[in-house]
Regions:
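Nuclease catalytic cores that cleave nucleic-acid phosphodiester bonds
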Residues: 2-115
Length: 115
């Protein structure tokens, strides 16, 4: 198992890093070139700047059994389909049992914001 961190979970990278070090688990952080970190104590996977470019790279590299940490429910749904485990940055475990409700809430929220 590896821990894959979507760059959007940026505020918790150091905490996640400490946990992965304690449990001797590999951790990779995916960021686009506009958000690169200098001297990070973990591997940073650099992605092109663009809509969903980081998400597409994560999906390309993600393996069954990996743990993805993200706040993107769309990415979470696709990761579940690849057999990965998914945690929201709030700590919520995202599963096949709750992803539909989370995606529906996202859709309704976006629709309300447009109104």
């Amino acid at each position: 198992m590896r821990v894959i961190v979507d760059g959007d979970a940026a505020m918790y990278k150091n905490d996640i890093c400490q946990l992965t070090l304690n449990y001797q688990i590999e951790m990779f952080v995916y960021l686009d070139y506009a958000h690169l970190l200098k001297d990070a104590p973990y591997p940073v996977i650099e992605c092109e700047i663009g809509k969903d470019s980081v998400d597409m790279r994560i999906l390309s590299d993600l393996k069954k059994g990996d743990l993805l940490i993200t706040q993107d429910y769309g990415l979470a749904a696709l990761a579940l389909g690849k057999g990965a485990y998914v945690l929201h940055i709030s700590g919520l475990k995202i599963t096949s049992q709750n992803i539909d409700e989370l995606l529906l809430r996202r859709y309704i929220g976006a629709h309300q914001r447009k109104s």
